[in-house]
Structures are given as structure tokens and as C-alpha cells.
Amino acid sequence: EIADGDWSSDVCSSDLREYIDLTMGDREKRVLITYVSAYGYTREMAEAIATGIESAGNIGIKILDIEHAGLGEIESELVRSDAILVGSPTINQNTLLQVYKLFAIINPLRDKGKLAAAFGSFGWSGEAAGIIAANLRALKLKVMDENAAFKFRPEEEKRTELAAFGNRFAKELLS
């Protein structure tokens, strides 16, 4: 028998509440924006994309730095989310290791069909966004046809383009 206030009753109650929240009726759509950033540019991109998503309406947004968030936290947020964006700089013509670790927690059975998109900053070649998109497709997510990739820091004009990208992503999610 579980005593009131016992940790296991709290866990069971919170899990049940979460299950009900996830499965019952209309709820706010949720977007998870994950990124890793070498010089802060990809973080700035994530923030600009979030601004565009916010402008589309009633969508909850969670932004997580893959390098600092635990994989358990990221997976928990992914389970609650209807869509995911993944960002990375291009270093040595590739995305970063942290992004590959993120791919390991995306479950094609559980997450199949979730809307997804890739974004990233680069200095020279810019392959990261394409690599991310290809991996998201392989994991059975519904990847937008466009990625957002910009050279170095996204200045004001680029941030406006990123917000528009986020808005298009949100509208596709809501459609």
C-alpha cells in the first residue's frame, strides 16, 4: 500500500497527470528547439526562429542547448512536443557530436511523423543543416523542405529571415 506523501505516489500521480495532459482533448501545440553552438551564433538563430514561431499563435516553445541539457531532459521534452528543430554549426564539414547523441534518443516508432527542421551557422562550407535534415528523415520525422543556414552571426536582416522561417514552420505545424 502506498502511503499519502510517499515518493512513489507522487511519481505515479505526476506520471498519470502527464499522461492525461498528453492524451486528452485539444492542447497547445509544443515545439522543441534544440541546438549546439560553438560561438553563440546557432543560439542566436534558435532565438530568432522561436520569435517567428511565437508570432504564429498558441504554440508552446522550449529551447534547449544540447551541450548543457541532459539527454533525459531532452527526451522528456521531445515526448511532450509535436515538432522539433535541430541546429548546429558546421565544423570540419559536419555537425557536432552532441547532435548525433540527440539522434540516438529520437525514436522512429514514437516520434514518426513529427514535424522537424534543421538550422545552422557556418564559416565556410555549411553542411550541418543538410546532414541534420537527412538524419531526421531517416528517423521518420516529417522534415520541412527548407533548412535555415547562414554564414557566421545572423545580423538583423538574417534574424528577420529566421523569424519568417520559424513562422512558416509554426503554420505548417498548425495546419
PLM region descriptions:
Residues 13, 67-145:
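Helix-loop-strand module that forms the ligand-binding subsite of alpha/beta enzymes
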Residues 10, 40-43, 93-96, 125-127, ...:
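Loop/helix-junction capping segments adjacent to catalytic residues or to phosphate/diphosphate-binding pockets
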Residues 42-46, 50, 99, 129:
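Short, highly selective alpha-helical patches that border small-molecule cofactor pockets
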Residues 12-31:
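Terminal amphipathic helices with adjacent charged low-complexity linkers/tails
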Residues 44-62, 137-142:
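Short helix-loop-beta junction
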Residues 30-34, 117:
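Conserved beta-strand elements of the Class I
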Residues 1-11:
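Single conserved hydrophobic/aromatic residue that forms the stacking wall/gate
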Residues 147-175:
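Glycine-rich phosphate/pyrophosphate-binding loop and the adjoining helix
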